[in-house]
Amino acid sequence: MISADSRPRLARKARLRTDRHTGETLLLYPEHGLVLSPSAAAILRLCDGRSAAAIADELAAPLDDVLEFLATLGDRGLVTT
């Protein structure tokens, strides 16, 4: 479970990449990929040891939205704490 104090990071199997043709940010993992919205990409780029609360503060985003997004990816094994 991800809380405000959790320090989320991408799972080892997941990678963020920018598509050189479209400029879109992709979350790649074995045999799959997701095209991320700009806000989703910003959240994941800040998963560098900061707490979830610090990520929300940095982006001026509602903490509940950040936690929900990270929990969804956590359920898929793409984010760990």
Regions found by a protein language model. Give the residues of each.
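Long, charge-rich, low-complexity alpha-helical segments
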Residues: 32-81
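Acidic, low-complexity/disordered tracts enriched in E/D and polar residues
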Residues: 1-45
